[in-house]
Amino acid sequence: MLTSPITTPQFQSRVLALLSSTLSTHTEEDITKTKNASPVTIPSLTPADTPLTPDESISQLIGVTSSWIDLSSPDPIIADVSRQVLKLELAYAAFCGITYALIPGPRLRGQGVSESGFAQYARAIQDALAQGPYMQLYIWLPMIDDSEDQTEEMGDLAPFARPEFLDQVDGETKRLDLFGSWEAWDMIRSICKYPSRLCVALSIPKLLPPVAIQSRWYSEPVRLLTFDAKVFSKNAKGYPVLSRAHQALISRFIRLRSAPWVLLCDVGPIPGQTTDGNGTNVSAPGSAGGFPTLAEAADTNSRPLKDPTPHLSYMRNLQTKQPVQTALDRFGAGYQDYLQTPLQPLTVNLESITYEVFEKDPIKYAWYERAIARALHDWIEQGKPTSNPDGRVVVAVVGAGRGPLVTRALKASEDVGVEIDMWALEKNPNAFVLLQRHNETTWNHRVNLVKSDMRTWRGPIRPANAHQHARRVFNVDGDGEDDNDVAKKNDGEPQSLSVQTTFTGSPSLDSTYLLATSQNPSATPTPYKIDILISELLGSFADNELSPECLDGVQHLLNPVHGISIPASYTAHITPIAAPKLHADIKHGMSSSNPNAAEIPYVVMLNAIDYLSTTPNSETSAASASTTASTNTGTPAPYSEAHTHSQVPQSESQSPASSSSPTPTPTPIIGTTWSFQHPNPSLPQASPSELSNSVPSITNAHNARTSTLTFPIPNRGTCHGIAGYFETVLYKGVELSTNPNTMDAKSEGMISWFPIYFPLKVCDYERSEY
């Protein structure tokens, strides 16, 4: 795409002449008070005032509004004239079909600059948004308010401001404000109420500012990165190149869901095109028809061919050399900064596609398998007695879903060489059908299947002929009866069960807990405990999908002396963030249909955000190294050569950093809120259930948690919400983490969980503490 000015220098001359005439005529009076309408009325555009016409090529142009106006001027006449010019330009651009308009930002330095001027500029932009309902407005701002970029040119309206208005404000900026440009943008978009059609065109300087400022702009809706010719350096061959820091900046922005365009400024004309005095494209010199003469053609052929657009060629070459996307980047391509409602697997039966997304994780289930293998290895090595008298370790997966953890548990058992008594429990009737199919086709009938809510399950049972390892299918309906109740019906007389042994479905009988392969119906089955309890009930904030409530409800089935829970513990963490895109999506996209949209949490793959609480720059590297050293327990070693199948390829999870890697962001300060442990050592005394005396019931008061945290804010910014993460210890030495400070060391490349986002209904402006 190309840029084109919306108006010509002739239009500028007309406006300046009209303004000068008006001001010179009314030198002794304040015409802003004596006239009801605008003191200076700008006439409509004429054909000579604009190079644009509504044709087929108009969609390939970015319209640029006049840079000589001053929307933030303290002089009301200058500000009013500027608003009229902007309104005329955008109205005509919208008529022609321009969909992108580039508007120079407010003056950040110089006499008359103030916060009230920024608010005045924002009001003008808010009015401009109404000029074209389908037009995107890009506010052109520098990354920092560099005084060298704030030069005034001949014909600018700013010098026309009258002295009596300039005296009312502090003229010169006292010192360089690195966040001044961002703060001006923050005020503009806040006053305009975060419209989706208002974005940023960011001018990149030759010397990049600190990483904290780069990260702040990364979180904003930047749609254009503009590079001036002076930003480039020359290599040994004389071609323009960018520094490594600039390359890293571009690489980071390219990873955004909506990657910005790159706009090259003042890098020379496009071959074959030049402009006349009005900015209109004309043919290159040559014959009247645009063709070169014979002499010109011969001279062109005699010269060696050179790249006519070296800056453009370099940027295209840089684009092709971007690093290969990681598994996490490929998986999350469509999820970046996309608000999702957290799952409720306890109350809603999940669809197969939801399970499938989780099962694509290259890390999670490999780490679960390692945790199970370690637990089995330690169980036998420490000589712990098993709950099953036949010597097999009783392993139960509660909430089995489509069975990935069951498969991993069976593999771990084979690799370590420890035989297990495998149980799988699932309440979703649809997923339970698939589990039974897996038991036939994949697991070779090695798994006991139970359809039940884990909180009402009475645990594994052993028939009288327990020496036969017959695998069973159980079906718990809802009335609280199990196989013991069925066997003792009719005044204690055992009742024969007519069931099939094909394991293709639940028996269609009036019982509530049926043993599908009872060899001796007259015998009373014996319940026994679970040695290793496995679950994957964690949510994005650890406990937000009721993992503590569910596991507390099944803890009475766990071996009270040696029982192991995988996971063994988990901790929730939070940090304040700036997330303008998420705030705008909730404000405009969800609040209309759900008035409480800003008061519920969301699961989000956070990308275009900025951490507000970070370590000082001098401590970032040391903190990162300390975190890695303290949390990197190393890849859990396999217990046999066969167990190496769970190793993750180096290229996916632990690829070495390359020289083209983006500049690291500041290390966020992430606070710990609360933790849960399983088995829970402080579980209250259970009482008989209302459904059945054999199913204990406990209250949930012990799971209440509150936390108050304080975060230092090194740089001023706007807090839009709280980001939540978790860390979990599956088994000693095997951990999972979504905490950005520890994830790479504990479970790099994991994609099963996105962070949770707690939005603020009203944004909170944070001032710098340093």
Language-model features: locations:
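Buried hydrophobic packing segments
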Residues: 372, 406-409, 554
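Conserved SAM-binding loop of SAM-dependent methyltransferases across substrates and taxa
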Residues: 402-418
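Conserved class I S-adenosyl-L-methionine
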Residues: 389-401
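Class I SAM-binding transferase module
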Residues: 1-283, 287-343, 350-352, 359-360, ...
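Hydrophobic alpha-helical cores of multi-pass transmembrane domains in eukaryotic membrane proteins
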Residues: 401-402, 534
